[in-house]
From Swiss-Prot:
E3 protein ligase that mediates ufmylation, the covalent attachment of the ubiquitin-like modifier UFM1 to lysine residues on target proteins, and which plays a key role in various processes, such as ribosome recycling, response to DNA damage, interferon response or reticulophagy (also called ER-phagy). As part of the UREL complex, plays a key role in ribosome recycling by catalyzing mono-ufmylation of RPL26/uL24 subunit of the 60S ribosome. Its EC number is 2.3.2.-. Residues 407-470, 743-763 are annotated as: Disordered. It is an enzyme of class 2 (transferase). Residues 748-760 have a biased composition (Acidic residues). Residues 444-453 have a biased composition (Basic residues). One of its GO terms (biological process) is positive regulation of autophagy. Belongs to the UFL1 family. It comes from the Eukaryota. Residues 2-212 are annotated as: Required for E3 UFM1-protein ligase activity. One of its GO terms (molecular function) is UFM1 ligase activity. Keywords: Chromosome, Cytoplasm, DNA damage, DNA repair, Endoplasmic reticulum, Membrane, Nucleus, Transferase, Ubl conjugation pathway. This is E3 UFM1-protein ligase 1.
Length: 789
């Protein structure tokens, strides 16, 4: 029992100790941070942690510390410095600084610095001390000294003028502050200096020499002049050109200007400038406000001179003569000024259509120009008649055709000699225009209608040609130098420069008139030669028929070859026989516009394009297609365009019959044989022999270029005996070697030709030995060879 009570007392004592014991549990730092973070997130607590993250600061504490630092620093502190002192992020410093500026009008935020009114008052006191010492201060100097913007400083100091700062701000140049004593001292200096001036003096020189403040000087000077304290005027504005002119000098100056103008009727700007007037034009306008003056580049003239020139020009225009206005005006006036004066006079007379200005100073009437034109009338007619006799061709002259032909020949001559010789051979084979014109059906040819034809030199016609080169050809009348010689003979009193410009002016109209005279002469000549034109119509019909049938027969011969060879043969036909028949049509159509040439084969692509530009719309389209197809590679297209062109020109094409074809084949073969007999050129012999053997084998004519000879020889394999074909192959190889050796010989130097010459001689001898045998393949065919029936 006693033990139980003892246990109870012990438990009671433990309970009592537990009741009176203190709690020893505390929150950890991490728990504190989490709690504060949660409170900040729920916006129940507004604090800012420091940059080192060890402390929290309230915004109110930041504001308090900013105020304290601003006071300690004398009313001006940089926000960046506050960040280092308060040890929080710059963003929080800026936010609190903006709040302080909004809440307190006495604090301003300028260029990242907090500035209060007490600092500005202290600043104004310092500036005032400096102002009283120097007499003037400039805002720009203060900006550099105190590191503050000019506008802010000007505004802050303006509020303290008269209160803290004893001075005034220059009203025209608000960047300077003066004291009254400084202004009075400068006014006295300016008054004394300008009172002593007796001649025009540039103000800028005085500023530099005596060290005046520029804006202050101009304002004081203007005040003294307006109050008549200084007798004079400032001309040229408030710039570097400003000049102070004393009244005594101005009166003398004005008297001279008035006297000169009264006596001469004009004023030179350069003379006034030498008198010390920096702005002569402005001075004259100001002095002679009510006087009617004409201002030129370097002078001005009075109405009296203008009236005198106007009367002289009017008389010249009425009498049909000319005059050099420079003789009526002062010699000091420049040519440019005289030209301006003349333009004004011509506008006032309103007779621009009756008179022209040459050389800037000479007025020439239209009547005088017409009389000069008449001097060339007889010359035009005589020259046109002479040209018609010497060159009875027309808007496309023989000379133009010759020039075009020479250009083409110059290009052809640059080719290899082999191609040149073979070209001659093919021209020989294609130039035979045989055919029984008597057996053919008559071809009816009628000239195209002229209805709707437009003038050849119209813009629309020019555009339709599709090239800027197809301009109407002009007959040359006279060169400008020749015209000058004629004018000098008849106008001996005219100056040289007038003769030159007059000839230049007449060049185009005289040339145009000459074209009309030539047209007239040629038209009369054409009408008189109509009978002879009808006489040649039959020849034209026969030649067209022969060419057309030849093209058809040559086309048959191309069908025996591969596509590539056919294309080459077609191109050659288009460049030769097809071009001939195209030129024949173009030459015939061109006769309507007096555009013919006796030798139509000399017509080039350029000349055909020019002829197209003269044709009416309904004819031009088909003829353009025909002209373009010559540059293609399809005989079918060309023949279809040829048929269309023949329909447009009312040329009825009749294909030849079998009898006529045999006759043409025979004539063509005989022509080639005759050519083969007389030639000794190995390349030409090979070419003619191959073409004749082809005709013997196929009974078809062939018009081929030299480069197609190997293909013809390959075709003959199996068509002629093997020994004949082998002879052709051998002869072909020798011809190729000869051409190669000739080419190398032309490229090598003279001292390296011995070996090449020996090889060439060997080849030449071999060719001479078998040339006769090759010719005999055609001239003396064996019975075993295939011959034409």
């Amino acid at each position: 029992m006693a033990a139980d009570w003892e246990e109870i007392r012990r438990l009671a004592a433990d309970f009592q100790r537990a009741q009176f014991a203190e709690a020893a549990h505390r929150l950890s730092e991490r728990n504190c941070i989490e709690i504060v973070t949660k409170l900040i997130a729920e916006k129940q607590l507004e604090v800012v942690h420091t940059l080192d993250g060890k402390e929290y600061v309230t915004p109110a504490q930041i504001s308090k510390e900013i105020w304290d630092e601003l006071s300690v620093c004398g009313g001006r502190i940089n926000i960046v410095d506050l960040q280092q002192i308060i040890n929080v992020d710059l963003l929080h410093i800026e936010n609190r600084a903006n709040d302080i500026v909004k809440s307190d009008k006495a604090v301003q935020l300028v260029l990242g610095q907090l500035i209060n009114e007490s600092y500005l008052d202290q600043l104004a006191e310092e500036i005032n001390d400096k102002l009283q010492e120097t007499g003037q201060v400039t805002i720009s100097e203060l900006c550099k000294a105190y590191d503050l913007p000019g506008d802010f400083l000007t505004q802050a100091l303006s509020k303290r003028l008269g209160r803290i700062i004893h001075g005034r701000l220059d009203q025209e140049n608000r960047g300077v502050i003066f004291t009254e004593a400084f202004v009075s001292r400068h006014r006295a200096r300016i008054r004394g200096l300008f009172s002593a001036i007796t001649r025009p003096t540039p103000v800028s020189n005085l500023i530099t020499r005596y060290g005046f403040q520029e804006h202050l000087l101009y304002s004081v000077l203007e005040e003294l002049v307006n109050t008549s304290r200084l007798k004079g005027t400032v001309v040229g504005g408030k710039q570097d050109k400003a000049v102070f002119v004393p009244d005594i000098y101005a009166r003398t100056q004005s008297n001279w200007v008035d006297s000169f103008f009264k006596q001469n009727g004009y004023l030179e700007f350069d003379a006034l400038y030498r008198l010390g007037i920096p702005d002569p034009a402005g001075y004259i306008k100001k002095r002679y406000k009510s006087t009617k003056l004409l201002f030129l580049r370097a002078a001005c003239v009075g109405q009296e001179i203008v009236d005198r020139v106007e009367a002289s020009v009017d008389e010249v225009i009425s009498s049909g003569s000319w005059i050099d206005v420079a003789t009526l005006l002062p010699s000091s006036l420049s040519v440019e000024d005289i030209g301006i004066l003349l333009q004004q006079v011509m506008r006032s007379l309103n007779k621009n259509s009756s008179g022209l200005v040459f050389s800037d100073t000479i007025v020439v009437s239209e009547k005088f120009i017409s009389s000069c034109t008449d001097l060339f009338s007889d010359m035009m007619k005589q020259k046109a008649e002479k040209e018609m006799k010497n060159s009875p061709v027309h808007l496309i002259t023989e000379e133009d055709l010759k020039q075009s032909y020479v250009l083409e020949n110059s290009y052809t001559n640059k080719k290899d000699k082999k191609d040149e010789r073979r070209k001659k051979a093919t021209e020989g084979s294609g130039s035979v225009r045989g055919g029984g014109g008597g057996n053919a059906r008559e071809i009816k040819i009628k000239k195209t209608k002229k209805k709707g034809r437009k003038d050849a030199d119209s813009d629309e016609e020019s555009q339709a040609t599709g090239t800027g080169r197809n301009k109407q050809l002009e007959f040359h009348f006279m060169s400008q130098e020749e015209m000058q010689d004629v004018l000098k003979t008849h106008l001996q009193d005219c100056p040289e420069e007038l003769i030159t410009e007059l000839a230049e002016h007449l060049m185009r109209p005289l040339t145009k008139s000459y074209q009309e005279v030539v047209r007239s002469v040629f038209t009369s000549s054409t009408s008189s030669s109509g009978a002879s034109g009808r006489q040649t119509m039959k020849d034209l019909q026969e030649e067209f028929s022969n060419l057309y049938n030849n093209i058809r027969l040559f086309e048959k011969g191309t069908k025996y070859f591969t596509d590539e060879t056919q294309t080459n043969l077609a191109k050659h036909l288009l460049k030769t026989v097809c071009t001939d028949i195209t030129n024949l049509i173009f030459n015939f159509l061109a006769s309507d516009s007096m555009m013919t040439t006796e030798n139509y084969s000399t017509i080039t692509s350029e000349v055909r394009t020019k002829i197209l530009g003269k044709l009416p719309e309904d004819t031009r389209g088909p003829l353009t297609k025909l002209h373009t197809s010559l540059n293609g590679k399809s005989l079918e297209d060309f023949l279809s365009y040829l048929d269309a062109a023949a329909d447009i020109c009312d040329i009825m094409v009749k294909k030849g019959d079998k009898k006529k074809e045999r006759q043409v084949l025979f004539q063509h073969r005989q022509a080639l044989i005759e050519q083969l007999k007389v030639t000794e050129d190995p390349a030409l012999v090979l070419h003619l022999t191959a073409v004749l053997l082809f005709q013997f084998s196929t009974h078809c004519m062939l018009h081929a270029p030299g480069r197609s000879v190997p293909q013809i020889i390959n075709f003959l394999s199996g068509k002629i005996p093997e020994d004949q074909h082998s002879l052709l192959i051998k002869y072909q190889g020798l011809v190729v070697k000869q051409l190669i050796s000739q080419s190398k010989k032309a490229e090598q130097e003279d001292d390296n030709k011995t070996e090449e010459e020996e090889g060439a001689d060997t080849i030449r001898k071999e060719l001479q030995e078998i040339t006769t045998s090759v010719k005999d393949l055609v001239l003396r065919p064996r019975k075993s060879s295939v011959t034409e029936e």
